[in-house]
Every structure is written in structure tokens, then in C-alpha cells.
Amino acid sequence: MQPVSVDTVHAPTRELHGGVTIRHPVLVTLVSLELVLLAVQFVLGMFVDLYVTFPSPVFGMYGLMQLMFQPGMGAVMAHMMTGMVLGALTLLTFAAAALSRNTLLIATTGGTFAAVVAAGISGMEFLFSGQNNAYSYGMSLGFLAAFALAFLSLLVAYGRGR
């Protein structure tokens, strides 16, 4: 049995055809999934923005239950649930990056997690503030930051950055 070096444990690599080596294959998979979910989140958010009409923020006797039975709220719920899954995935990716001990990966995945959380908080504030456009803008900035940082994380995990 051969001894396992620290480099093998903390920076696994995978050789592809053509001599391309992936430095962190697990992180490449996780960040790729993040990017796919961010794209789904964008499409759902645009649908909600264009086609869902929100009622007044003053809730009646049944409060939020009445709000959820409005037309188009299924898309809002899908948007919210995708955001929660995305938040959990970015936290998992951040933890995996911390195990890799790569400072740049830790910074980019941590930034992605922070951007997703900021976008989610802005989304909740948007929903409960009477659709204040500042919170909608906050969601869009959070999305842009998360997408850019996730793409940068993918490049670093792939071995293109140091």
C-alpha cells in the first residue's frame, strides 16, 4: 500500500482526454450545478417579474395563506424553493472549498454564498415591503455577483487560476 500525500488528499486531480487536468473535480461538479441552478433561478425570476401580480402588502384575516392562493404564486414558490436549494448548495460548495485549502477557491465560493444569501434576503424584503424596487434591484445585484463569482470559482477549480 502506497502512502497518501497531503497534496493528494487536499487537491485531488483528474486527467481528461488531451492532457487536461482538473484540480478539484468535486468542486467543478458542485459549482457547475450552482451555475445551472442560477440559470433556472434567473428564468423563474423573470417569469415572476413579468407575469405575476402581487396583491397589497396589507394582509387580511388569513394573512399569507390568502396571498399564496393568488394566480402565479406557484412560480413565486418555485423561485423561493430554488433559492433555498441554491443557498444550501453554495454553503456545501463553500465547505468543500474550505477542505481544499485553496485560498482563492475559499474566497470565491464564500462570496458566492454571501451573494446568494443577500439576494434571498432582498427577495423576502421585496415580497413583504409592497414590492419596493430597491429590493428587486438588490436581488438582481445578488444574482449577478453570485453568477460571476461562481463562474470564477469554476475556473479556479478547473485549474485555470491559482
Language-model-detected regions and their locations in the chain:
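Polytopic transmembrane helical bundles with strong interfacial aromatic enrichment
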Residues: 2-162
